[in-house]
From Swiss-Prot:
The lineage of its organism: Eukaryota, Fungi, Fungi incertae sedis, Microsporidia, Unikaryonidae. GO terms for molecular function: DNA binding; DNA-binding transcription factor activity, RNA polymerase II-specific. It comes from Encephalitozoon cuniculi (strain GB-M1) (Microsporidian parasite). The keyword Nucleus applies. It is found in: Nucleus. This is Homeobox protein HD-11. InterPro entries: HD (IPR001356), Homeobox_CS (IPR017970), Homeodomain-like_sf (IPR009057). Residues 30-89 bind DNA.
Length: 138
């Protein structure tokens, strides 16, 4: 079990490494037009936001490759979400945000990111929403 998980992790890291070496192909992303995020992408971003309000640059790049969203878009999503919490002025949200602002960027390990994406993919699929994801990603 451990060796299989280690092998899967190495394969995942190798695949992400190759994608990073090749660089982001801008034609993969729709340029000049605003794109709505799919339900899967939004669920994954919300789950990451629960873990860290300030993900590191490495985490953002890894996440961008895993959910097929441009890193700048992910960065702006986190900024907008933090701002929305501040604007609402909810006591709980403001306290959580104030606590996290004291910390610097958090690096979330790749296996955890991959697990979160897989869990959210299963959840979206379980509720019959995978059709929405497939249509939106085309």
């Amino acid at each position: 079990m451990t060796s299989e998980r280690t092998k899967n992790l190495r394969e995942l890291e190798a695949a992400l490494g190759l994608l990073k070496l090749s660089g982001f192909q801008m034609n993969r992303y729709c340029t000049g037009k605003q794109m709505r995020k799919t339900r899967l992408q939004t669920c994954v971003l919300n789950r990451i936001f629960e873990i860290s309000r300030f993900p590191s640059s490495k985490t953002i790049v890894d996440l961008a490759l895993l959910i097929n969203v441009h890193p700048k878009s992910i960065q702006k999503w986190f900024q907008n979400t933090r701002q929305a919490i501040r604007k609402k002025g909810s006591t709980k949200g403001a306290l959580l945000l104030a606590e996290s602002e004291e910390h610097s960027a958090v690096d979330i390990p790749l296996p955890i990111l991959a697990d979160i994406v897989e869990i959210e993919r299963r959840t979206v699929s379980k509720f019959g929403l995978e059709r929405v994801f497939l249509q939106d990603s085309n």
